[in-house]
Amino acid sequence: MTVSGSRRHSRGATEPWASSPRRLGRFGIWRSASLVTPELAAGIERLGFGALWLGSSPAGDLAQAEELLEATTTLTLATSIVNMWQDQPQDVARSFARVQRRHPGRFLLGVGAGHREATQQYARPYQALARYVDVLQAGGVPRDSLVLAALGPKVLGLARDRAAGAIPYLVPPGHTRQARAVLGPGPLLAPEHKVVLDTDPDQARALGRTTVHPHLGMVNYTSNLRRLGWTDDDLSGSGSDALIDALVAHGSPAEIAAQLTRHLDAGADHVCLQLITDEGADPLPGYRALAPALGLS
């Protein structure tokens, strides 16, 4: 099966983010910025993915995004996310202006608060994020080029009212449904979802746990999962099988496509897939295997 015929999913030009030259498409690639090269970005573009999301706190000077934009012609580059505790908003706004001048309509700035456990300055993140958005927009970053990392209803509301939308991380489709209810019909909703190409469930879960497990020690993620009904038993250790199955799509390309489509059915506009492989493995063959099942090539 392919995803292309599975649902209508087009709210069209009523969406402010959709009226720009930027087109994300239904599926993009999420990958840690340190693992992305210009050659990989060009390969992702050739396969038909609409966006490349630079994860794990890419630098706010946006130099890498600019380099990747130079290496591609149509791919949207996005940050997921610039950490507001690590980069001053005035500097990020100036960097955004530089990138926008050189590559108009192809860059989406994702910002957020990161994790309490990883950031010494982390305090009152909602108020700090709202102020950060104030400074970015005063510095010329337009609302339709700004998205926020958001999990709970308060920050989702900020993403609805002050930005183009939200980019939730480590969420099942049930969260997407709740997030769309908070955002309403207009704003962009682009959740991240992990993927393992392996038809052996035990092996797939084992590989998925290598990426999920560290996040189960982070309060923002566990609090969000508890809001969704997951229990302490699910969240203990490296996560229950049911939790891993909800957070990591695995199986054949067709089976994975069906799992990712649940986000679209729940109200997402775009899904950022994070392919998990053995350390050091080239992800491009996996992207190539997934693209036809996702209706991309």
Describe every region a protein language model picked out.
Residues 2-297:
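Active-site-adjacent structural elements that line small-molecule/cofactor binding pockets in enzymes
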